[in-house]
Amino acid sequence: MTKPAILALADGSIFRGEAIGADGQTVGEVVFNTAMTGYQEILTDPSYAQQIVTLTYPHIGNTGTTPEDAESSRVWSAGLVIRDLPLLASNWRNTQSLPEYLKANNVVAIAGIDTRRLTRILREKGAQNGCILAGDNISEEAAIAAARGFPGLKGMDLAKVVSTKERYEWRSSVWELKTDSHPTIDAADLPYHVVAFDYGVKLNILRMLVARGCRVTVVPAQTPASEVLALNPDGVFLSNGPGDPEPCDYAIQAIKEILETEIPVFGICLGHQLLALASGAKTVKMGHGHHGANHPVQDLDTGVVMITSQNHGFAVDEATLPGNVRAIHKSLFDGTLQGIERTDKSAFSFQGHPEASPGPTDVAPLFDRFTDAMAKRR
């Protein structure tokens, strides 16, 4: 038997539906994602920490879940909002239905609401703080009060919260269909050593680095530059992650010191924003951010348009770029900056997600650019 659930926004909007996950309360910034598939990858993406994700595609849960599709060791999304939960989860890789998965991971979620109306509110008013209450004896007043009590993501440093606490090595490569697994590559077959700062790294990023010949050492977000340089890396990677980049002063300082060397640097998502801040630019909070797998981005050097996966609520302010940083990619949705490169260093970054998971891999060649830079330095 289903239990009732409420989604309340800080502006007082109320949506009533049914609980499809754990009972209880969750609060966070409510955002919408336009991807048609990949809900498990989205839920386990650390970049969604403290965010309640609304999926605009109406039918979510058709394919169930599988451990192989997780992008981290746990669910990071604060909650899930969907329109319709299919009665049947059908896929040869399915090991657990979506409701079972949500309950097992203690995720509060709601289905059966008008996600189109909700998305219009978020588009017109911007991302809002919200609360999901699920179970018996829930009240609209309590949900609204909880939503208004959430402080918001501006000024919130979440990178050090989601980051690994210990350094570790990574040699698992991209998924293989024939084995339904991610093969481990022998270190002797990986010519490049990359140190990756974990600000909330997705596993498919690490796998794509390995697939291109990189032995990856993952270090905590607060690792000093001196410890990274002592590992003698061929390249340094700055990962994706949640929250506001500006409070991450430890990361900005480490990146500044690494940029004083000639070691190639590549950043994605939060790593892109941190590279910009370390180079003297500024970041801004976006209205409703970019969340989806169908965002067109243009390469400003070639004019080529690529469809990309996006997940960010902050952006680099192009007007603040110093003279030694140039724009190399732009969003064709709103013109916001999507990529930068240093003109005086071997350092570049991309705001979206070249690793996809979920989404298209049009921008995956940026990983090749990174390995090419490491090869050139040798």
Swiss-Prot record:
The keyword Amino-acid biosynthesis applies. The active site is at 269 (nucleophile), 353, 355. Keywords: Amino-acid biosynthesis, Arginine biosynthesis, ATP-binding, Glutamine amidotransferase, Ligase, Nucleotide-binding, Pyrimidine biosynthesis. GO terms for biological process: 'de novo' pyrimidine nucleobase biosynthetic process; 'de novo' UMP biosynthetic process; glutamine metabolic process; L-arginine biosynthetic process. CDD domains: GATase1_CPSase. The keyword Signal does not apply. Its EC number is 6.3.5.5. Residues 193-378 form the Glutamine amidotransferase type-1 domain. It catalyses: hydrogencarbonate + L-glutamine + 2 ATP + H2O = carbamoyl phosphate + L-glutamate + 2 ADP + phosphate + 2 H(+). PROSITE patterns: GATASE_TYPE_1. Residues 1-189 are annotated as: CPSase. GO terms for molecular function: ATP binding; carbamoyl-phosphate synthase (glutamine-hydrolyzing) activity; glutaminase activity. Small subunit of the glutamine-dependent carbamoyl phosphate synthetase (CPSase). CPSase catalyzes the formation of carbamoyl phosphate from the ammonia moiety of glutamine, carbonate, and phosphate donated by ATP, constituting the first step of 2 biosynthetic pathways, one leading to arginine and/or urea and the other to pyrimidine nucleotides. The small subunit (glutamine amidotransferase) binds and cleaves glutamine to supply the large subunit with the substrate ammonia. Composed of two chains; the small (or glutamine) chain promotes the hydrolysis of glutamine to ammonia, which is used by the large (or ammonia) chain to synthesize carbamoyl phosphate. Tetramer of heterodimers (alpha,beta)4. Belongs to the CarA family. PANTHER family: CARBAMOYL-PHOSPHATE SYNTHASE SMALL CHAIN, MULTIFUNCTIONAL TRYPTOPHAN BIOSYNTHESIS PROTEIN-RELATED. This is Carbamoyl phosphate synthase small chain.
